Regions:
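Helical (often loop-to-helix) elements that flank the catalytic cores of nucleotide-handling enzymes
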Residues: 91, 345-358, 562-568, 572-573
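Conserved short strand/loop->alpha-helix "switch" segment adjacent to the catalytic nucleotide/phosphoryl-transfer site
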Residues: 29-48
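GHKL-family ATPase ATP-binding module
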Residues: 2-17, 24, 46-48, 56-58, ...
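Short adenine-binding "F-helix/F-box" segment of the Bergerat
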Residues: 90-91, 98
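A short glycine-centered beta->alpha linker in the GHKL/HATPase_c
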Residues: 84-89
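C-terminal interaction appendages of subunits in large macromolecular complexes
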Residues: 392-411, 426-431, 442, 446-448, ...
């Protein structure tokens, strides 16, 4: 963008563009309503709200560099080189436009169509929400050759906007300190921020995002830093997601167009895996529950591929009926669209409801894919051959499921014989423990509360579904036992489909309970992979948990304490043993089977005392990449990951 264009843009972006919708008081009273929650997720959401403002400037064409810094004191600084928030007088509010943006909820250029055609941010509450939830916030605006500043406490300005210097740059710098009386966690996680910044860089090609952590110095003496920048955007994004998978076709099928007034960008790649991995975004928001844009994409993909295959008489050898699922096996795709007024619905407000979008995406994908298939007959044949193989495997899987249901020794009501069910039939209160090994399963069965806790022992390591064909999973006893115990069906409205249906889910808490060792962690990961690939809705709706049995029982005389970490154990030694390890008795639990039923209940199963880790699907594309890298065929990336995360690997699935 030329300086002249930027100056014209500055002239057009002023106080008159700032629209005000409502006041701030409610935010501090009900923060979760505005940012999702007040734990680690909400804490990081504050950063995303500020960065979204800068991304909006970039989408409008006025900004190409965003710097995000985690400061030593866990405050955050975000600076961009956009036009700077307007500082002129706002007629209606009778104060500076900057103060309006910073102190009034839903005030900002994103609500005035002339300023931004589209804007990011799921909750769209703007930077004022961040201000309200911070003990202190400082805003500096670089605009018109001057530096303007205002500071706030809990959303209230400490003084009017004032000039504090001169400058040759333009942009906005925000620094904020999250309020520890509101947030249960105030320590920022670098990896969580890096994941989102990487995602934003891929979704917005040409924008440089620098992330720096002033709390950590590298071996070379410099602060920890990454620069996220993508020239090719979505093309690079699908390559990144698929980096540990074997490609079926080396091409990335790339679509970047506008249909019916909706900008549509799509990147498609086929690999040799058996999973469908489609990640959809609206205005940079990950629409985990899909919506009309995803429906339009699927419709176009199925119709176009099927027509090409039929026209070229390629389906005659299939001998089975082809369904929509079959066209998507081994597919990795990213769909990114921009919508002026998105309507979000669904359980987590991440499902797009705009009907007009379906036709736009359908048309864009249909036209581009049809052209690609005609121009690349060799690659097209490889894709269609994989579709036929997928259809045959799906039919084999259905037969395997039916066969298991006929043959397997079931307890009453078609449940696995090993399942020790609970007496309650209310899914809201029922819990299912997936327990490693029969001996631990025995202790769990004796120690549980039979009213609402069910136990399903698993024999050894379950099948790694990342490497298995679809029908192989249904030939596995352990996988089938889990599916049947949970009451999961496949297919919607009687259709033979891979889509999991959890409408009749029997337990709203599914708890993985394994030994606190390497083998136990491996089993955790195998089970999480099964859920992520075959019935991700269980994770999306927050029903999957991991139990955390204690590592030690420390005893000194009559004082007993269970310890979950080495730090807790050390604290016990310092408190009761005068710092001497020999002065206390430590029992190290190597497995669940070493605990008697009462101990297992007391430490790991009793809702009053236990600690559960909820498995979140925070970032589907990153989880997709992590699972394929950890559980796939390629050893190199897995070794690198394990070496980098040797002491602590956080699979934020």
């Amino acid at each position: 963008m030329t300086e002249e264009e930027k100056i014209n843009g500055e002239n057009n972006y002023s106080a008159s563009n700032i629209q005000v919708l409502e006041g701030l008081e409610a935010v501090r009273k009900r923060p979760a309503m505005y940012i999702g929650d007040i734990s680690i997720k909400g804490l990081h959401h504050l950063v995303y709200e500020v960065v979204d403002n800068s991304i909006d400037e970039a989408l409008a064409g006025y900004c190409d560099h965003i710097e995000v810094t985690i400061n030593e004191d866990n405050s955050i600084t975000v600076q961009d080189n956009g036009r700077g928030i307007p500082v002129d007088f706002h007629e209606k509010e009778q104060k500076s436009a900057l103060e309006v943006v910073m102190t009034v909820l839903h005030a900002g250029g994103k609500f005035d169509k002339g300023s931004y055609k589209v804007s990011g941010g799921l909750h769209g509450v703007g930077v004022s929400c961040v201000n309200a939830l911070s003990t202190h916030m400082t805003t500096q605006v670089f605009r018109n050759g001057k530096i303007y500043q205002q500071e706030y406490e809990c959303g209230h300005p400490l003084y009017s906007v004032k000039e504090v210097g001169v400058t040759e740059i333009t942009g906005t710098r925000q620094q904020f300190w999250p309020d520890d009386t509101i947030f249960t966690e105030t320590v920022y996680n670098y990896d969580i921020l890096a994941t989102r910044m990487r995602e934003l860089a891929y979704l917005n090609a040409g924008i440089k995002i620098t992330l720096t952590d002033l709390r950590v110095k590298e071996e070379d003496g410099n602060y920890k830093q990454e620069i996220f920048y993508s020239v090719e955007g979505l093309k690079e994004f699908v390559r990144y997601i698929d980096s540990s998978r074997e490609h079926l076709v080396n091409d990335v099928i790339y679509i970047n167009t506008e249909k019916q007034g909706t900008p549509v960008e799509v990147a498609i790649m086929y690999n040799t895996s058996y999973n469908e991995n489609i990640h959809s975004y609206v205005n940079n928001i990950n629409t985990i529950e899909g919506g009309t844009h995803l429906a339009g994409f699927r419709r176009a993909l199925t119709r176009t591929l099927k027509k090409y295959a039929e026209d070229n008489k390629m389906l005659e050898k299939a001998k089975v009926e082809i369904s929509g699922d079959d066209f998507r096996e081994g597919l990795t795709a990213v769909i990114s669209i921009k919508v002026a007024e998105p309507q979000f619905e669904g359980q987590t407000k991440t499902k797009l409801g705009n009907n007009e979008v379906m036709g736009a995406v359908d048309q864009a994908v249909g036209e581009a894919l049809s052209y690609y298939l005609e121009e690349h007959p060799k690659e097209s044949k490889m894709i269609v051959d994989k579709v036929i193989l997928a259809a045959q495997a799906r039919v084999a899987a259905r037969k395997a499921r039916e066969s298991v249901q006929r043959k397997s020794p079931m307890s009453g009501g078609g449940m696995p014989g090993k399942l020790a069910d609970c007496s309650s039939k209310d899914p809201e209160e029922c819990e299912l423990f997936l327990v490693e090994g029969d001996s631990a399963g025995g202790s769990a069965k004796q120690g549980r509360n039979r009213t609402f806790q069910a136990i399903l022992p698993l024999r050894g390591k379950i099948l790694n579904v990342e490497k298995a064909m679809w029908h192989k999973a249904f030939e596995s006893d352990e996988v089938n036992n889990i599916i049947q115990a949970l009451g999961i069906r496949f297919g919607v409205d009687g259709e033979d489909s891979k889509e999991a249906n959890i409408d009749k889910l029997r337990y709203k808490k599914v708890i993985i309970m394994t030994d606190a060792d390497v083998d136990g962690s491996h089993i955790d990961t195998l089970i999480m992979t099964l859920f992520f690939r075959y019935f991700p809705q269980v994770i999306q709706q927050g029903y999957l948990y991991i139990a955390t049995p204690p590592l030690y029982l420390c005893t000194k005389g009559k004082v007993k304490e269970y310890c979950w970490t080495d730090q807790q154990r050390q604290k016990f030694i310092d408190t009761y043993g005068g710092g001497s390890e020999n002065a206390i008795h430590t029992q190290r639990y190597k497995g669940l089977g070493e605990m008697n039923p009462e101990q297992l209940w007391e430490t790991t199963m009793n809702p009053e005392n236990r600690m559960l880790k909820q498995v979140h699907l925070e970032n589907a594309a990153e989880a997709d990449y992590t699972f394929s890298m950890l559980m796939g065929e390629d050893v190199g990336p897995r070794r690198d990951f394990i070496e980098k995360n040797a002491t602590y690997a956080n699979i934020d699935a």
